[in-house]
């Protein structure tokens, strides 16, 4: 039975629902279950699910699930392509407007916290243009020192940007440092638009684990299941294409990078498993750090039953729908 919301024209602002949380907390299952009973459309907010042919290692909903529960922003890029934060912001605004136009509510589900934050803060502000002298200085540092030196500089100046930029993504590290040296403000500071008022009534939920230990154990079990379901073969097909490399954003996804190193004989099979689990746990810690500092968040427990979770979500939405 579909639970009806009040008429949309009565809302002061159109409704948008966030369902966030660390990896392996069953966000997708909850979102798909909600779609059975609420007038919603699902939108993926996951920087890994955008890639075609990367299904097992990203824990993407199955083809059958996607057929029954379509998700916007899933399978929209080839692994050779990139997808910037700016592109996401433009796409998500169009998608939200479309969903509202068909009298549905967008439910944004995923674990890429920076994408959620961008929607709350109004996108990326105008960043300073590149400065040739500063860029030359940074390139000289890169040549004389190393990419690790530059990344550590970024970590000390702008730890939030360092959390979301991989140290191998040298161009983005350089750009973040360049922005700071030109403007005197970090990329994170410049991305927070002052006095931005969202045009949406955003109700935010996070699905949180009962403990880190519980989640880490689940991550281990899940990765072993991925291996048994053909994850190695999935990455091997990408590896054999010949046009992909490990510094692409797609191949830097957790698990794919480590399996790539295994194929390049940089890791043993056992080390690949160990490093994949370590990388996943680092990702989880980063996600939890974001969420622990998040404002106006309705926290749900992943150990709760689906029935109870749905009841709580509907109750919170009804309480906030005319705010």
From Swiss-Prot:
Could you say which residues bind ATP here? Answer: 21-28
What Gene Ontology terms for biological process does this UniProt record contain? tRNA modification
Keywords from the UniProt entry: ATP-binding, Magnesium, Nucleotide-binding, Transferase, tRNA processing
Question: Which residues are listed under the site Interaction with substrate tRNA?
Answer: 112, 135
| Coiled-coil region list | none
Which cofactors does the annotated protein need, by name?
A: Mg(2+)
Q: Region (Interaction with substrate tRNA): which ranges?
A: 46-49, 171-175, 252-257
Catalysis: reaction(s)? adenosine(37) in tRNA + dimethylallyl diphosphate = N(6)-dimethylallyladenosine(37) in tRNA + diphosphate
Functionally, this protein is described as follows: Catalyzes the transfer of a dimethylallyl group onto the adenine at position 37 in tRNAs that read codons beginning with uridine, leading to the formation of N6-(dimethylallyl)adenosine (i(6)A).
What family does the Swiss-Prot or TrEMBL record give for this protein?
Belongs to the IPP transferase family.
Q: Record's HAMAP family?
A: IPP_trans
Protein name from the UniProt record: tRNA dimethylallyltransferase
Species of the source: Buchnera aphidicola subsp. Baizongia pistaciae (strain Bp)
């Amino acid at each position: 039975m579909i639970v009806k919301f009040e008429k949309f024209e009565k809302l002061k602002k159109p409704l948008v629902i966030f369902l966030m949380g660390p990896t392996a907390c069953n966000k997708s299952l909850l979102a798909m279950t909600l779609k059975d009973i609420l007038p919603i459309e699902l939108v993926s907010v996951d920087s890994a699910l955008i890639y075609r042919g990367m299904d097992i290692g990203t824990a993407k909903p199955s083809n059958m699930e996607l057929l029954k529960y379509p998700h916007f922003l899933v399978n929209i890029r080839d692994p050779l392509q990139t997808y910037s934060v700016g592109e996401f912001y433009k796409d998500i605004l169009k998608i939200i407007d479309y969903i509202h136009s068909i009298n549905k509510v967008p439910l944004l589900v995923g674990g890429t916290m920076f994408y959620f934050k961008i929607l709350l803060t109004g996108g990326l502000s105008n960043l300073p243009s590149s400065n040739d002298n500063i860029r030359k200085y940074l390139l000289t540092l890169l040549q004389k020192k190393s990419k690790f030196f530059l990344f550590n500089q970024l970590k000390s100046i702008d730890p939030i940007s360092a959390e979301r930029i991989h140290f191998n993504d040298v161009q983005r590290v350089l750009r973040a440092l360049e922005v700071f040296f030109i403007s005197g403000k970090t990329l994170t500071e410049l991305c927070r638009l002052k006095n931005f008022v969202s045009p949406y009534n955003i109700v935010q939920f996070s699905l949180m684990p009962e403990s880190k230990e519980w989640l880490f154990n689940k991550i281990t079990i899940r990765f072993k299941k991925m291996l048994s379901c053909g994850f190695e073969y999935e990455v091997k097909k990408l590896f054999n294409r010949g046009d992909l490399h490990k510094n692409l954003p797609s191949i830097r996804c957790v698990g794919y990078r480590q399996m790539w190193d295994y194929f390049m004989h940089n890791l043993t099979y056992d080390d690949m498993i160990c490093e994949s689990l370590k990388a996943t746990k680092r990702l989880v810690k980063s996600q939890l750090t974001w969420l622990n500092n998040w404002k106006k968040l309705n926290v749900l427990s992943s150990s709760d039953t689906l029935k109870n979770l749905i009841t709580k979500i509907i109750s919170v939405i009804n309480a906030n729908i005319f705010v």
